[in-house]
Amino acid sequence: DAANAYNAGLPPDADPYFATIQHLRVSSHVLIARDGSLTQYVPFHERAWHAGRSYWRGRDECNDFSVGIELEGTDEEPYDDRQYETLARLILALQQTYPMLADGWIAGHSDIAPGRKTDPGPAFDWRRLERDLRANGARFRREVLA
């Protein structure tokens, strides 16, 4: 189940695959479900384990300085309108609450760990997110390294 996957809560005896990954330290600050609902797992001021070995804009270990937002879905399946709406509201709130995020830099896991992570994938509409954010006064800056 998607909620448990991002909270390091998959029971190893529920599926043989879960047993093979039980040693991984995986978590996320939030998960935005297909219906747009948001579940927070880790407080924003604490470290979540979503990025793994990563590099972005001159810094290693993105878990140390980033917010991990997961979207339920696959790389190829278009995300739901409600997910984009929730994501834009969340980013705006984060930029207003945390001055270090107000510069507007936003990256996907595929940007910070290319070759190892693929999300949010080609189905994610970055232009739509930018429009939604700018329409509500949020900043949006993106640098694709791949």
Q: Which role fits each region the language model picked out?
A:
Residues 60, 75-146:
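Basic/polar, cationic surfaces and motifs that engage anionic cell-wall
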Residues 1-100:
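Active-site-adjacent loop/helix surface patches within enzyme catalytic domains
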